[in-house]
């Protein structure tokens, strides 16, 4: 059936068809770099990086663009408070953002444009809208004529009359209509500005993404994505600007991830539950944070708590332990000619891969895909119970675990110190091997643990262990 994605525009799950066969043009709204990102900001980075990875896994050539908003009211305020330039603030937090994403194993975008580097294109875009009658200048500001775009509200599914009624609460004498939004802001004291046909000023927020998407991906793109908080007004305004400027459909698929709560409450500084992504990565490890995020469907809200993180850690531990156990058995697995057992394992492995693909094809359902990975672990563990295992089959399970977890951006093959739970699992396996009089396997586990610096002591009360 192929990949299907839930399109916010239609509110339906739709078959995924690209503008150009085999190629995907994808734009994801990036951060405003005035501070370190919080854990909620990390969610779209992780889920849409996973989408990108899966599209590549399925054979697509993906061009992934994520912008950096490096000029904004908040940036200007921080720069003025610190007595530095806006660029200095932006550079500092852009570097921090990229470092945070690296710790979460989020691949860098193919293109990471910045607003300050796109000013000429933004001015050209605004001028084009004015010339087409979709925008107007008012005392140095430039506004978009929302009423000229009859489809305004089609992404957020809000009737234009309702939007207009709500906008009347805010009175701005510069606007022709309360719902009109700013494309270019006239200069104010203490702000960074650029020269334009309308005088000194700087861009409005919404026009920036439209201009950067046009510059680096063209008039039409396949996927535009971001958090649900961006549906209105940001993405709604992007559509209005872009489609009025080009006369073409801006994006085929609009994807939005659900929000993240902390202990079932909205994250806010006033509640004292404002958690930075870097702090959590340092405390729990970026791989665990990523795994936790992917345990829920990307479109649904997700709740963060230390209890849930601990549960996620247990799940991730099951996967890494299975891979470790497989790698340990590889040394003693025997090379053999194909037989009925080998054919059965090949069939099981093939079916598991197909199930994983089916779940990911279904609107990138990482939650169900992880369930399939747990089934891989289960089948691998069942196979390892055999006294004699084949090298081909052990390696096939290892390769499958790496293949599927890499799609999710997890690195289970990285050499790591044995976790306590992994040591306990190996000791339990050794005990079972001794009960079954499989002394070769028992000695193999002891030697393996010794190589990892783990000393075993057999006592009347059971096996004790310690690190050298």
From Swiss-Prot:
Location within or outside the cell: Cytoplasm
Alphabetized SMART domains for the sequence: DALR_2
Cofactor(s) the protein needs: Zn(2+)
Sequence similarity: Belongs to the class-I aminoacyl-tRNA synthetase family.
SUPFAM superfamilies registered for this protein in UniProt: Anticodon-binding domain of a subclass of class I aminoacyl-tRNA synthetases, Nucleotidylyl transferase
Subunit structure as annotated in this protein's UniProt entry: Monomer.
Motif 'KMSKS' region: where in chain: 266-270
InterPro entries associated with the record: Cys-tRNA-ligase, Cys-tRNA-synt_Ia_DALR, Cys-tRNA/MSH_ligase, CysS_C, Rossmann-like_a/b/a_fold, tRNA-synt_1_cat_dom, tRNAsynth_Ia_anticodon-bd
Enzyme Commission number(s) from the entry: 6.1.1.16
Entries under Pfam families matching the protein: CysS_C, DALR_2, tRNA-synt_1e
Chief location bin: cytoplasm
Gene Ontology CC annotations of this record: cytosol
Signal peptide interval: none
Motif stretch ('HIGH' region): 31-41
Catalysis performed (reactions): tRNA(Cys) + L-cysteine + ATP = L-cysteinyl-tRNA(Cys) + AMP + diphosphate
Gene field: cysS
Keyword terms of this UniProt record: Aminoacyl-tRNA synthetase, ATP-binding, Cytoplasm, Ligase, Metal-binding, Nucleotide-binding, Protein biosynthesis, Zinc
Keyword Chloroplast: no
PANTHER family to which the protein is assigned, alphabetical: CYSTEINE--TRNA LIGASE, CYTOPLASMIC, CYSTEINYL-TRNA SYNTHETASE
Residues reported to bind ATP: 269
Protein name: Cysteine--tRNA ligase
Stretches of the chain forming a coiled coil according to its record: none
Cofactor binding notes: Binds 1 zinc ion per subunit.
Molecular function GO terms recorded: ATP binding; cysteine-tRNA ligase activity; zinc ion binding
Residues engaged in binding Zn(2+): 29, 209, 234, 238
GO biological process assignments: cysteinyl-tRNA aminoacylation
């Amino acid at each position: 059936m192929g990949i299907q994605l839930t399109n916010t525009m239609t509110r339906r799950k739709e078959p995924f068809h690209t503008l150009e066969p085999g190629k995907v043009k994808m734009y994801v709204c990036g951060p405003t770099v005035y501070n370190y990102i919080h854990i909620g900001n990390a969610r779209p980075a992780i889920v849409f990086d996973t989408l990108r990875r899966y599209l590549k896994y399925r054979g697509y050539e993906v061009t992934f663009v994520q912008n950096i908003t490096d000029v904004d009211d908040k940036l200007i305020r921080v720069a003025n408070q610190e007595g530095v330039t806006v660029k200095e603030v932006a550079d500092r937090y852009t570097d921090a953002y990229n470092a945070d994403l690296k710790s979460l194993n989020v691949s860098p975008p193919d293109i990471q444009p910045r607003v300050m580097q796109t000013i000429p294109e933004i001015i050209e875009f605004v001028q084009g809208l004015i010339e087409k009658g979709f925008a107007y200048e008012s005392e140095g500001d430039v506004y978009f004529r929302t009423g000229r775009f009859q489809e305004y509200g089609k992404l957020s599914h809000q009737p234009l009359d309702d939007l207009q009624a709500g906008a009347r609460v805010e009175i701005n004498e510069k606007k022709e209509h309360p719902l009109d939004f700013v494309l270019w802001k006239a200069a104010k004291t203490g702000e960074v500005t650029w020269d334009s046909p309308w005088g000194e000023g700087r861009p409005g927020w919404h026009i920036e993404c439209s201009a950067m998407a046009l510059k680096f991906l063209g008039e039409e793109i396949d996927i535009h994505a971001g958090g649900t908080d961006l549906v209105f007004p940001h993405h709604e305004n992007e559509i209005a600007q872009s489609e009025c400027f080009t006369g073409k459909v801006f994006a085929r698929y609009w994807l939005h991830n659900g929000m993240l709560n902390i202990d079932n409450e909205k994250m806010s500084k006033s509640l004292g539950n404002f958690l930075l992504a870097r702090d959590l990565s340092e405390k729990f490890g970026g791989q665990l944070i990523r795994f936790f995020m992917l345990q829920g469907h990307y479109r649904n809200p997700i709740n963060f708590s230390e209890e849930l993180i601990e549960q996620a850690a247990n799940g991730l531990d099951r996967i890494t332990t299975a891979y470790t156990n497989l790698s340990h058995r590889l040394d003693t697995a025997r090379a053999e000619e194909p037989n009925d057992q080998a054919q059965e394992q090949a069939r099981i492995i093939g079916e598991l891969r197909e199930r994983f693909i089916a779940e990911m094809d279904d609107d990138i359902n990482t939650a169900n895909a992880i369930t399939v990975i747990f089934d891989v672990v289960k089948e691998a563990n069942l196979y390892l119970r055999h006294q004699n295992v084949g090298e081909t089959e052990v390696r096939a399970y290892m390769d499958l675990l790496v293949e599927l977890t890499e799609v999710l951006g997890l690195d289970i093959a990285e050499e790591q110190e044995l976790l306590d739970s992994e040591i306990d699992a190996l000791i339990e396996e050794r005990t079972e091997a001794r009960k079954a009089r499989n002394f070769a396997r028992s000695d193999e586990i002891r030697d393996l643990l010794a190589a990892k610096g783990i000393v075993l002591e057999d006592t009347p009360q059971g096996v004790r262990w310690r690190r050298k």
